Design a protein with these regions (language model features):
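Short helix-loop-beta junction
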Residues: 134-152
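Short beta->alpha junction loops
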Residues: 152-158
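A short, acidic, amphipathic alpha-helical segment used as a generic capping/interface helix at domain edges
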Residues: 159-163
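Conserved thiamine diphosphate
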Residues: 2-124, 133, 149
């Protein structure tokens, strides 16, 4: 059995950090943690409900894989890959619906491997999660000004794809 735990990211990562560190990450337990409503998704509920440091805190813990999918298609691919992936994983998702980055699920997905979403030689924009759509829109606007921007979807924050 492979446990999946879902909870608001602000509580999942900060209130249970000692248990995540010792009982999940250090022992390389095959647990998948899903932080929902990450970032400032809970807006008006105030700073106690914002999860701005979840990625930074979990990035400092050994053996933890951190994934932030860009859209529903990538989330589906990621979940399918996690079925065969052993080890602790933190998945960060927002609260609100996100714009599609992919138009279907006909693409390759590999945990730990970034994906070039738009090619360009003038500059590179690296994004993850719902910001990938924003980066793609920015690349289109830059193209209108004669600037060719590469957009890289860094869906896996840790381990970081150094290629």
């Amino acid at each position: 059995m492979k446990p999946y735990v879902a909870s608001p990211a602000c509580f999942l990562t900060m209130r249970s950090i000692e248990q995540i560190k010792v009982d999940v990450a250090y022992s390389k337990t095959d647990v998948k943690l899903i932080g929902i409503s990450a970032g400032v998704s809970y807006g008006a509920l105030g700073m106690s409900h914002h999860s701005l440091q979840d990625i930074a805190v979990l990035n400092a813990i050994p053996n933890m894989t951190i994934i932030v999918p860009a859209d529903p298609y990538e989330t589906k691919k990621m979940m399918n890959k996690l079925a065969d992936f052993h080890g602790p994983v933190y998945i960060r998702v927002g609260r609100n619906p996100v714009s599609e980055v992919y138009h279907d699920d006909n693409f390759d997905y590999e945990i730990g491997k970034a994906k070039i979403m738009h090619d360009g030689d003038d500059l590179s924009i690296v994004a993850y999660g719902e910001m990938v759509r924003v980066a793609l829109d920015a690349a289109i606007q830059l193209e209108l000004q004669g600037i060719q921007a590469r957009v890289i979807n860094m869906h896996t924050i840790k381990p970081f794809d150094q290629e």
